């Protein structure tokens, strides 16, 4: 045994995305809630629970500097769509929820039926093609622009006019409509070009 070896690794994410805490004496936190001071940027300093197998037990929503994510049995959520508590969310490639108007892949038909590409979207999304001379980023066979609130909840009930950072857009069931054309908005009519504006 070499007494000069330092084991104070602190919080460590393992290959399976679960986390452990390695103390200075090479022991692991287990069976209790402990104040973690050396979190290595994975979590803020604070009190966290560990099970008998030394695994950090995060369950539920968690917000840190990188964003908001969801943990289940100590494992951070991966990328993609999910239904949590009856609300739909999209998690980016780092496992954090998206907010605002964001282009993401379509959800699976099992999760959200009716939210796939339509023939017109896929046909017009060719840069430089007639109908797309300005190379707008139209929906395609893989993804489209969806609306999420500040908590990351997909706004599937939202329909009508939507202010996208000063640009007026037309939304139908939480999804940007690129080819809305003439639409009735209350007592007025609005015309939306193929670019969704």
Which residue stretches match the model-derived regions?
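Extracellular adhesion/carbohydrate-binding repeat motifs centered on closely spaced tryptophans
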Residues: 1-197
């Amino acid at each position: 045994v070499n007494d000069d070896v330092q084991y104070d690794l602190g919080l460590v994410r393992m290959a399976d995305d679960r986390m452990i805490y390695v103390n200075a004496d090479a022991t692991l936190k287990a069976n209790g809630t402990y104040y973690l001071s050396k979190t290595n940027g994975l979590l803020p300093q604070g009190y966290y629970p560990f099970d008998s197998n030394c695994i950090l037990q995060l369950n539920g929503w968690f917000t840190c500097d990188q964003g908001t994510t969801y943990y289940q049995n100590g494992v951070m959520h991966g990328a993609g769509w999910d239904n949590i508590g009856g609300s739909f969310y999209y998690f980016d490639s780092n496992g954090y929820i998206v907010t605002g108007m964001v282009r993401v892949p379509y959800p699976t038909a099992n999760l959200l039926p009716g939210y796939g590409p339509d023939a017109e979207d896929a046909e017009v999304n060719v840069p430089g093609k007639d109908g797309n001379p300005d190379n707008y980023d139209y929906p395609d066979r893989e993804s489209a622009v969806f609306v999420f609130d500040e908590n990351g909840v997909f706004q599937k009930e939202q329909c009508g006019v939507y202010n996208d950072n000063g640009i007026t857009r037309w939304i139908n069931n939480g999804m940007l409509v690129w080819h809305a054309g003439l639409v009735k908005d209350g007592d007025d009519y609005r015309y939306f070009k193929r670019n969704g504006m």
